[in-house]
Swiss-Prot record:
Belongs to the glycosyltransferase 61 family. This is Protein O-linked-mannose beta-1,4-N-acetylglucosaminyltransferase 2. It is a single-pass type II membrane protein. It catalyses: 3-O-(alpha-D-mannosyl)-L-threonyl-[protein] + UDP-N-acetyl-alpha-D-glucosamine = 3-O-(N-acetyl-beta-D-glucosaminyl-(1->4)-alpha-D-mannosyl)-L-threonyl-[protein] + UDP + H(+). The keyword Cytoplasm does not apply. One of its GO terms (molecular function) is protein O-acetylglucosaminyltransferase activity. Residues 26-578 are lumenal. It is found in: Endoplasmic reticulum membrane. The gene is pomgnt2. Keywords: Endoplasmic reticulum, Glycoprotein, Glycosyltransferase, Membrane, Signal-anchor, Transferase, Transmembrane, Transmembrane helix.
Length: 578
């Protein structure tokens, strides 16, 4: 081989090495540039600074971690570290590593039917949440993740255009989910994954966080793979009081766990966000009438306003969601004496009424008030202390129907003629499931001429407290503790008579309370028997002789009762032998 060939080969090798080093430097530059861009995208989400390399390393090494509260998918909320979301696949991703945690580890039961509900509506098949699983090693084949540094609350809104759903299904559950978990606060960010646009009441959702809530569609602009450093998925349902009839006809939930105290605490928070100060010294009593402009109209509204003003000697004010700002409506309701409205979502604003106020709900012809009670249930929650009145139009000549409208507005022309005639002749809509029952829609979208004398009579016969006295101090019912130092002494007189002397001390908390009526309930049960003898007593000791037998063992339970309805816990059982 000649010297020129060797030199040429050496030159090629040197050039190749230089080019390779240049390419590696260029690749490294692009990687750094990409990481800077991903860091910038993360910074756009939040002011929290994030170390991108450290976050990526933690995701690869630790994978996703999940710990949930709740036994069933209907009451479960899950806390995640490094839960990811593919905006292309529209799937949440759980990355497995040796350090991953998944509690509960349900295996295939996670799909029966889901890990959890994304909304506060129980077990609705459009609201289920789950994730797909991948090994953390798969990250090398996927788009570089964009990390979300904010603590995230990931959920579905159920129907953001309906005010009842906004408050009952979304705002109240969000508010108390934030109270429930220490990591969540008003610096957390809300992520709405149901796919709706902002909706009519988006400004109300903004009160739940100091950061702009993000919609599912907006996530695509942030990156192809989003990873939430810390997130909570799902909502607490503890504040919900109503079920909408997806499985059985609608009605109050079987086990209501919220009271008016929690509702009013939330209402106070909302009023603060709306910059409304409650006027405790407002002297003038007035009635608010909710007016509707599209359907379910009160056709003699002006006449009704005048009659209410004359009958109750109060000013009457008309408001509507279309013509008044939400803050103006709440400001008026917060000092109102009475709210009158046709059945509809706007009645959820009754949660802003002062204690003692009257809620009058009007129902069109054929709609049984006992079958549709979300606002009655709200008004009568313990601690809400609202007076609720339901009035139904029972006169068919006072209703205006619209059979030619589209079906979703109560039209029935799409039905067979025989079915149309049956619906028109029907006197009452039978109980039904949600949400497209044509007879229900036909009747609920009627307009109504209110029989004013009938309505006033119903109000006066139902309202027991004098109107305008709502600003008195109201006391929340507090429950007694256990009675203390309970004792039992038995005595027998021969073989035919015996007595039990039972005594106890007052509950410890009674000495700090002013209670009008204090009673004690005593149960006496012969050991081995299923039945017992109950007694209600005013004193703290009593000698029982009726039905007490010698040479017999008795079990004795004692508890305190405040004001006839507030039942305390039973003290430890006493065992007494005669």
């Amino acid at each position: 081989m000649n010297i020129s060939a060797v030199f040429s080969a050496l030159l090629v090798s040197i050039m190749a090495a230089v080019l390779w080093k240049h390419v590696k430097l260029l690749d490294q530059f692009y990687v750094i540039e990409e990481e800077l861009e991903l860091t910038r995208q993360s910074q756009e989400l939040s002011q929290v600074r994030i170390d991108y390399q450290a976050a990526l390393q933690a995701l690869v090494e630790d994978g996703t971690r999940m710990v949930c509260s709740g036994r069933m998918h209907t009451d479960r909320v899950c806390r995640f570290e490094s839960l990811c979301y593919s905006t292309e696949a529209e799937e949440f991703v759980f990355f497995h590593s040796n350090a991953s945690i998944m509690l509960p580890n349900l295996g295939p039961r996670r799909f029966q039917p889901a890990l959890l509900d994304l909304s506060s509506v129980d077990d609705h098949n459009t609201q289920y949440f789950n994730f797909i699983e991948l090994p953390a090693a798969a990250l090398k084949f996927m788009p570089k993740p964009v990390f979300v540094p904010d603590v995230a609350l990931i959920m579905n809104r159920f129907n953001p255009d309906n005010l009842m759903h906004v408050f009952h299904d979304d705002l109240l559950p969000i508010f108390y989910t934030i109270q429930q978990f220490p990591d969540l606060d008003f610096e957390s960010r809300l992520f709405f994954m149901e796919g709706w646009n902002e909706g009519l009441h988006f400004e109300l959702y903004k009160f739940m966080s100091n950061k702009q809530p993000l919609l599912k569609e907006q996530l695509k602009t942030l990156g192809r793979l989003l990873c939430f450093t810390k997130s909570y998925v799902g909502l607490s349902k503890i504040t919900t009081w109503y079920q909408y009839g997806f499985v059985q006809p609608q009605g109050p939930k079987a086990n209501i766990l919220v009271s008016g105290n929690e509702i009013r605490h939330f209402a106070k928070f909302m009023m603060g966000k709306l910059n409304i100060t409650l006027d405790q010294n407002a002297a003038e009593a007035y009635i608010v009438l909710f007016s509707r402009s599209m359907n379910r109209l009160i056709v003699n509204e002006a006449e009704l306003l005048l009659a209410l003003a004359q009958e109750f000697q109060m000013k009457t004010i008309t408001v509507s969601l279309e013509d008044h700002s939400f803050s103006d409506i709440v400001r008026l309701l917060s000092n109102a004496t009475m709210l009158v409205s046709m059945h509809g979502a706007q009645l959820v604003t009754s949660l802003f009424l002062p204690k003692g106020a009257v809620v009058v709900e009007l129902f069109p012809y054929g709609i049984n008030p006992e079958h549709y009670t979300p606002y009655k249930t709200l008004s009568t929650l313990p601690g809400m202390e609202l007076q609720y009145v339901a009035w139904q139009n029972t006169e068919e000549e006072n209703t205006i129907t619209y059979p030619d409208r589209p079906w979703e507005q109560g039209g029935i022309v799409h039905l067979e003629t025989k079915e149309q005639e049956r619906i028109k002749k029907s006197k009452e809509v039978p109980r039904h499931l949600c949400c497209r029952n044509p007879e229900w829609l036909f009747r609920i979208y009627q307009d109504t001429k209110v029989n004013i004398s009938s309505l006033i009579q119903v109000i006066k016969s139902t309202v027991k407290k004098k109107l305008g006295l709502r600003r008195q101090k109201w006391t929340q019912g507090l429950y007694p503790g256990k009675v203390r130092e309970s004792k039992c002494q038995a005595s027998a007189q021969g073989t035919s008579e015996a007595k039990l002397f039972v005594s106890w001390q007052i509950p410890w908390n009674l000495k700090f309370l002013k209670v009008r009526d204090v009673k004690y309930e005593v149960w006496i049960q012969e050991q081995g028997e299923n039945s017992y003898m109950p007694y209600i007593l005013s004193q703290q000791n009593y000698t029982f002789s009726e039905n007490i037998k010698p040479f017999t063992t008795y079990l004795v339970w004692i508890r305190c009762i405040f004001n006839k309805t507030l039942l305390g816990p039973f003290a430890e059982v006493l065992v007494c032998s005669t």
